[in-house]
């Protein structure tokens, strides 16, 4: 099962920017790829979105979609514990989301709850066993939670080809 592109790409971009800012200028790896003005504008927009979604949640506390959008927004703001809490609320409201909730695994990873992240990616494999990106996240989580040796032993096996660059990355 493929993830919706509009959610996957922004989450990947934010994950990369949050974990290790990349530089457009190789000569200055400390320079952030986005201007300070652009970062402030994005942060302000996300903060406003959190306020609006919080009000919507007060009005309709059982709407899973509001928690989903607010959790994503908290993730973009690098407020990973709040992101996890909203993803957890989604699962509380709709138990069917538990297995398929890969975003919760990424939020747990950045919240430094590596065991929970590894578990989420493990159960996600039962939902979608051809998603090599999930296997990479699981490996990262297991390496942080249990060590590199156990993570290597726990590598998921894939029988079906996946989109590049994931097969190549997985071979590393």
Language model segments and positions:
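Residue-level recognition of tetratricopeptide repeat
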Residues: 38, 72, 106, 140-142
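Canonical positions in the second alpha-helix
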Residues: 55-56, 89-90, 123-124, 158
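Start-of-helix register in tetratricopeptide repeats
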Residues: 65, 99, 133-135, 140
């Amino acid at each position: 099962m493929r993830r919706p592109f509009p959610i996957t790409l922004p989450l990947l971009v934010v994950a990369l920017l949050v974990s290790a800012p990349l530089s457009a200028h190789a000569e200055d790896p400390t320079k952030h790829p986005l201007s300070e003005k652009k970062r402030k504008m994005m942060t302000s927009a996300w903060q406003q979105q959190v306020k609006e979604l919080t009000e919507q949640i007060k009005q309709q506390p059982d709407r899973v979609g509001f928690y989903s959008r607010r959790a994503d927004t908290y993730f973009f703001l690098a407020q990973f514990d709040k992101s996890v809490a909203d993803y957890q609320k989604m699962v509380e409201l709709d138990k069917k989301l538990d297995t398929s909730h890969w975003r919760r695994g990424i939020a747990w990873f950045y919240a430094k709850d590596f065991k929970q992240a590894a578990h989420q990616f493990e159960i996600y494999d039962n939902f979608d066993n051809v998603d090599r990106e999930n296997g990479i996240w699981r490996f990262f989580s297991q390496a942080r939670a249990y060590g590199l040796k156990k993570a290597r032993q726990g590598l998921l096996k894939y029988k079906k080809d996946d989109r590049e660059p994931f097969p190549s990355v997985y071979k590393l």
